[in-house]
Every structure is written in C-alpha cells, then in structure tokens.
Amino acid sequence: MSVKIHYQNTHFITSAPDIRHLPADEGIEIAFAGRSNAGKSSALNRLTNQKNLAKTSKTPGRTQLINLFKVTEGCHIVDLPGYGFAQVPLEMKNKWQKSLGEYLQKRECLKGLVVLMDIRHPMKDLDQQMIFWAIESRIPVQVLLTKADKLKSGARKAELLKVRKLAETFGGDVQVDVYSSLKGLGVDQLRAKLDTWFAPALAHLQEDEEGSNSAE
C-alpha cells in the first residue's frame, strides 16, 4: 500500500542562519528558492493549503533565515532566503549567497530544488547560479514560472517555451512549468513532482511499518 502525502499537514520546525545550525542531515529535504519578489511564500502556502505557513511580507528580502518545515516523517521542505533584493546591504547579500551556495553544495539530504521566478522576469543571474549549483551537486531542479495569471495564455506559452529552451543549455535534470498561487495553476503538478522526490523516504517508512507489524 502506497503512502499518500498530505501536504496540508506540513508544519514549521525551525529557522537557521546557515547550514551548521540546521537539524541532522538525514531524511529527504526539498528546497524552495527564488528572488525576493518571486512569490515563494504564496507558492508554499498554496501547495500546503495553508494561509500562513510561510509568512508573506510586504517588504521583499525580509526572510533572512533558512526555514525548515516537516511534511511527514523523514520528509522536509526548506524555504531558503529570498535573494536579489536591491535595497539589502551588499555585505548581507554576500552572506546570504554564501549560505545558499553552502546549503546546495553540502547538504546530503537535499534531493530536489524548486526555483521560483516571476514569469515576466525569468532566469536572472542569481536564478541561473542556483540552478548551476544544484546541477553541480546532481540535484534535480523544478523551475516554476510564478504569477502565470499575469500573462494571457499565448504569452504564457511563449514564455514557457523560451525558458524551457534556455533550461536545456544547463544540462542536468531541469524541468520548467508555469505556476499561479492565485489561480491554482500548476499546483497538482508540483505536488506530483514532490511526491516522486520524497518517494524513497516514504518507502523506508513503509518498510519500517511493515517490519514492526510482522514483528507483532
């Protein structure tokens, strides 16, 4: 019997300034990354059907910590600090970028990266840097073109094709899809993608349950 993931049960565990302050490097983590105005918090809230799981802020760049959420046993979502906000001091920007790079390159339990980009301003330099880091670490990437409702259907498809073509040049496992927190566009596909990334942890969970049942 397969284990179904109920994303609405996702809850906050802890915040950390860098990789050294995170809990033990075990289980499976899926990280969400994006520019400060990419709609990351709204996307996480829509994914989990919770209004305030990830705090949305009127001031981009407020999220300076790595935030860890538990989805189910052995499965976690990591909300990485938003990047690329112009009004943040350079020293802080550099610190964030170092933390992001360190996390993507050294965290063993990281098994997937979701990079969110405003569909009207995709593939900025830092977005591409995040993807490069993930590919170097052999981590699959799901690019979400957010705020897709802001474009009409034709323009949306054209932008999607353009970004998919660019994504092919990275090599590695990079998928690109559209997403709208407002309209719910792409939410089911995102859940399905996370299901596949979390599957090994769930398989272990099932084995443990079956083992304990047979022991009884």
Swiss-Prot record:
CDD domains hit by this protein: YihA_EngB
Underlying gene: engB
NCBIfam families the record matches: GTPase_YsxC
Pfam families: MMR_HSR1
Domain of life of the organism encoding this protein: Bacteria
Signal peptide: none
Keywords noted in UniProt: Cell cycle, Cell division, GTP-binding, Magnesium, Metal-binding, Nucleotide-binding, Septation
Ranges where the EngB-type G domain occurs: 26-200
Protein's UniProt keywords contain Magnesium: yes
UniProt: Mg(2+) binding residues: S41, T63
The protein's required cofactors: Mg(2+)
GO biological process: division septum assembly
Protein name, per record: Probable GTP-binding protein EngB
Family of this protein: Belongs to the TRAFAC class TrmE-Era-EngA-EngB-Septin-like GTPase superfamily. EngB GTPase family.
Native species: Vibrio vulnificus (strain YJ016)
GO terms, molecular function: GTP binding; metal ion binding
